[in-house]
A protein has these predicted regions:
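Conserved RecA-like P-loop NTPase ATPase core
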Residues: 36, 57, 120
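SF2 helicase motor core recognition
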Residues: 3-8, 29-30, 44-68, 72-93
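A conserved SF2-helicase RecA2
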Residues: 71-153
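Helicase motor interdomain insertion/brace
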Residues: 1-13, 129-130
Length: 153
């Protein structure tokens, strides 16, 4: 629903957008990706699950906006790699934007999105530290992760 709603909003505002999500057949996905690469439309709406692997957009796309994201670090990292590659020209930018909805809960600002993003950032730091130090650390159990995300509720 989110992808379709955002797409319709963009189209209503004169922005040529197309969508790829789980129900889009493979042949159609491939055509939509090729059309995006060739500039036939301005915005490609998708999600990290759908285009997590084997799609390179780095030659034509340098901005990613995450309206929703999964709690899976691998999905996020693979998704970010769709528009960023080693060897990009000097001065080439790549930007990532992360929407975060905030709500008043018990007279306090709360954002599930911000909490999930923070946990993803923590997981990425732990992963990079493990690679740099060649030492694996104990990480949170799924139950502890849930407590970190939902503990304020």
């Amino acid at each position: 629903d989110s992808i379709a709603s955002i797409s319709q909003c963009l189209i209503d505002n004169g922005i040529n957008a197309k969508c790829i999500y789980g129900a889009v057949p493979l042949e159609e996905r491939l055509q939509l990706i090729e059309d995006f690469r060739s500039g036939k439309y301005d915005v490609l709406l998708t999600n990290p699950h759908t285009l997590a692997e084997s799609v390179s957009l780095h030659s034509v796309c340098h901005d990613a906006i995450y309206y929703e994201y999964s709690y899976n670090l691998v999905h996020l990292l693979q998704s970010k790699d769709r528009i960023h590659r080693l060897g990009l020209p000097d001065g080439q930018y790549t930007q990532y934007y992360y929407f975060q909805n905030w709500y008043d809960y018990n007279e306090k600002a709360y954002s599930l999105d911000a909490n999930i993003y923070q946990r993803l950032s923590d997981k990425e730091r732990i992963m990079l530290d493990a690679i740099d130090n060649q030492h694996l650390e104990a990480v949170c159990t799924p139950e502890e992760d849930l407590e970190l995300i939902f503990g304020e509720l």
